Amino acid sequence: MGWFEGVKSPKLKSSKKTASSTPHGLWKKCNSCGEILQTEKLKDTRQVCPYCDHHFRLSAVDRVSLLMDKDSFKLTGQNLTTTNPLKFNDKKSYDVRLEEALGKTGLNDGTLCGIGKIHGDEVSLGVMNFQFMGGSMGVVTGEKIAWVMDQAYEKKIPAIVVCCSGGARMQEGILSLMQMVKTSASRQRLKNAGIPFISVLTDPTTGGVAASFAMLGDVNIAEPKALIGFAGPRVIEQSIRQTL
């Protein structure tokens, strides 16, 4: 046997320590300028990029906390839930989609409404939540938006709705389209009574919501660079077969 036969070379061990994984949610990338931002610092700027002024989408709960005086907002209508009147099914049943949206947001529907105060002045407020099925307007959302305006009418206080929606909820068919008329009628009653309605247009505000109450404010306020219109660019491109 030779001198070095049967001799095994020792395996080299790396001196590098395994890098610990970065906890999820510490950083967020700006969709506009591409900067990597600390989530905690974004809270200080109210979810606005300090480099390019891009406005990140906010949940309905976050918007309420930003707008309302502390502990002044009295939520209502949380027990309202939609059904599946058309027994709608596509890739998933409507019932399954509702359960998934509930699990994702913790809300029974895509709109929060209630009475609260802004700098001491009482207002009737509705806030739409894009995280719940794209903020689409179904029967429950239509009922809540109408409630916001009806409460403003009864209490003689301003109505404010923060719009954030892809439009009418297709899973509810004609019942969702009826909400366009319902909400517009409630808004008209406010106008006749001389009670102000402020519509805040955030990204995105499109479809049946844009074609109804969202554009009917005495004052319409839009976030910078928000997508606002009846049809979004993807729908238009698919319709005309051209790139915008």
Report residues per predicted region:
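Conserved catalytic cores of soluble enzyme domains
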Residues: 163-244
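Short cysteine-rich clusters marking metal-coordination/redox-active sites
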Residues: 30-33, 49-52
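Residues immediately within or flanking Cys/His clusters that coordinate Zn2+
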Residues: 27, 46
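An N-cap/entry alpha-helix motif that binds or orients negatively charged groups
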Residues: 11-20, 28-29, 56-113
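Cleft-lining beta-strand/loop regions that shape enzyme active-site pockets
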Residues: 110-191, 198
